[in-house]
Amino acid sequence: MQAFVLRAHRRALESLLRAGPAPSRIAIVGGGLFPRTALILTRLLPAAEVTVIDASAANLERARRLLADTTVRFAERRYDGEDESGYDLLVVPLAFDGNRDALYARPPAPAVLVHDWIWRRKGTSRVVSLALLKRINLIRR
């Protein structure tokens, strides 16, 4: 199942990333439990500086083990939805516990990839999987 999920996400992310300049600084919110987005983006954009932001020390420790052969950085903090202009790209998970509508209305970074339900199409969008009922939306400032 993990291989299927990784392939499906990779296809969607690869397609969306072609829609603009390659980001050099990326923040991934909540990517610690299973860092699929970090695994994919470090392969698609090997020159990019990637930071995983997660409030859980245990999740970050798991991510460190899975990403040991990468240069990914880790920040133990809760993402508050505020401005993240220091990054070219911010990635927000489906499980984001915050104001998703505010992310769409006022993107906190120049480009924001929002994992969302398949019926919530916003901006430039790609379906991840019908089986997962999931899509990724790309929002730009």
Which residue ranges define each predicted feature?
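S-adenosyl-L-methionine
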Residues: 1-22
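Conserved SAM/SAH-binding beta-strand->alpha-helix loop
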Residues: 56-58
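C-terminal substrate-binding/active-site "lid" region of AdoMet-derived donor-dependent transferases
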Residues: 100-141
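Conserved SAM-binding loop of SAM-dependent methyltransferases across substrates and taxa
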Residues: 33-47
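Conserved SAM-binding strand-loop segment of SAM-dependent methyltransferases
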Residues: 69-79
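Conserved SAM-binding motif I beta-strand of class I
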Residues: 49-54
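Conserved SAM-binding loop
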Residues: 63-64
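Conserved class I S-adenosyl-L-methionine
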Residues: 22-34
